[in-house]
């Protein structure tokens, strides 16, 4: 997963920890999968995997399917989880998370 940035086992454990609807916490998830401890460069590399349409931004529909990027077959985030995740990361209020906003969110 993630081109060697994160261990598959760590990603699977992070996804498993938020299997229940409305149990997703981005801070807990980033810590459990190991992303929050990575360098800004590695965090930017992870951004590319999540930005599925390659727009340079992570939009709401990409956040909804966020867990599936870490582990195939994972659940979609609920609308409430997705909106809270977007609100936490979208510091300039443009409705999407840019790469610098992403680094700040992961390191928060």
UniProtKB/Swiss-Prot annotation:
Coiled coil (UniProt feature): none
CDD domains documented for this protein: EFh_parvalbumin_beta (cd16255)
GO cellular component: cytoplasm
Binding-site residues, Ca(2+) 1: 51, 53, 55, 57, 59, 62
Entry-annotated residues carrying N-acetylalanine: 1
One GO MF term attached to the UniProt entry: calcium ion binding
A matching Pfam family: EF-hand_7
Keyword Protease tagged: no
Intrachain S-S bonds: 11-33
Annotated Ca(2+) 2 binding sites: 90, 92, 94, 96, 101
Sequence ranges assigned to domain EF-hand in this UniProt record: 38-73, 77-108
Keyword Cytoplasm: no
Alphabetical keyword list: Acetylation, Calcium, Disulfide bond, Metal-binding, Muscle protein, Repeat
Note: This parvalbumin has an isoelectric point of 4.50.
Protein family per UniProt: Belongs to the parvalbumin family.
Protein purpose: In muscle, parvalbumin is thought to be involved in relaxation after contraction. It binds two calcium ions.
Protein name stated in the entry: Parvalbumin beta
Lineage: Eukaryota, Metazoa, Chordata, Craniata, Vertebrata
